[in-house]
Amino acid sequence: MQRFIKWLAVITSLDLLIVLLGGALVTKTGSGQGCGKSWPLCNGEFVPSNLSMETIIELSHRLTSGSAGILVTLLCILSWKYYKHVRETKTLAILSFVFLVAQALMGAAAVVWGQMPAVLAIHFGISLISFASVILLTCLIFEIDQKFDARSLIMDKKMKFHIYGVTIYSYIVVYTGALVRHERASLACPDFPLCSKNRPMPTQLHEWVQMGHRVAAMLIFAWILYAMILAIRHYKQQPVVYWGWIISFILVTLQAIVGILVVFTNASLSMALLHSLFISCLFAVLCYLVMLGTRSKVNAKEAASTSKQTK
């Protein structure tokens, strides 16, 4: 059974990643109304008779979201049953399921009633939490902790502050990026790093949205760089923290490069999807570090208790 659960966890993780990228594809191609204002049917039909490209994209996204719902539900039930001895299992299972349902309902509401761009931008963030929760659940199932000796990890307050702070802030950056997409502001500023050679400062809403995201992205790049330097200096003996921050910096660097290329490639589809891919992976890594941070306090208490007993 454990072998089956491992395969299920991998397939579920991949399916949720496809859902995330599919949502970005729907937004990028303007396919949100590919099935009209009909849900769960498509244009009022179970199998649509007229298949335009927008309809195919929207319908494919709905199907992958539906399959993800089934897989996540099954994974939550099995992990709850067979891995309940691991402290985080129940919490992650609940988060995976609840946020997947929330993003599905929000997606349906957007189709039927429509939503403001500011509200639609939350949709990607909700999906991201479900994805990260399933990734963490998969890590627990594959016992990644034991390979990195993460169960004995103890961090200082400074490192935990950076882990929690960067993760929370990354969610804000994700929201600003999703807002850029839903406001159709990807090309509002044709230059980089300033908005325009002739107008360095934004002058209208779309430019402010674009430049706001750029500033937020620059700050998270600098923050992750600083945290990585701390990890390299002080956590060489803790591989999971050491490599966690190095991987985070690699991902945020790739994210920044692709973000710049979005501007200079006229917001090409491939760059837009890569942009969503890298931020999804980065958020999952940061969430894993958060999970380790919550354990650190417990590990420190256990170490102190053991020390007292030996004395």
Swiss-Prot record:
Residues 28-62, 113-121, 181-211, 265-271 are extracellular. The chain crosses the membrane at residues 7-27, 63-83, 92-112, 122-142, 160-180, 212-232, 244-264, 272-292. Heme b binds at residues 213, 275. Disulfide bonds join 35-42, 189-195. The active site is at residue 58. It comes from the Bacteria. Keywords: Cell membrane, Disulfide bond, Heme biosynthesis, Iron, Membrane, Metal-binding, Oxidoreductase, Transmembrane, Transmembrane helix. Residues 1-6, 84-91, 143-159, 233-243, 293-311 are cytoplasmic. Heme o binds at residues 61, 123. It is a multi-pass membrane protein. Pfam families: COX15-CtaA (PF02628). One of its GO terms (biological process) is heme A biosynthetic process. Pathway: Porphyrin-containing compound metabolism; heme A biosynthesis; heme A from heme O: step 1/1. The keyword Nucleotide-binding does not apply. The keyword Nucleotide-binding does not apply. Its cofactor is heme b. Its main location: membrane. The N-half (TM1-TM4) and C-half (TM5-TM8) domains are connected by an intracellular loop. Each domain is formed from four-helix bundles and they align in a pseudo twofold symmetry manner. The N-half domain is the substrate-heme O binding domain and the C-half domain is the cofactor heme B binding domain. Catalyzes the conversion of heme O to heme A by two successive hydroxylations of the methyl group at C8. The first hydroxylation forms heme I, the second hydroxylation results in an unstable dihydroxymethyl group, which spontaneously dehydrates, resulting in the formyl group of heme A. Belongs to the COX15/CtaA family. Type 1 subfamily. Interacts with CtaB. This is Heme A synthase. It comes from Bacillus cereus (strain ATCC 10987 / NRS 248). The gene is ctaA.
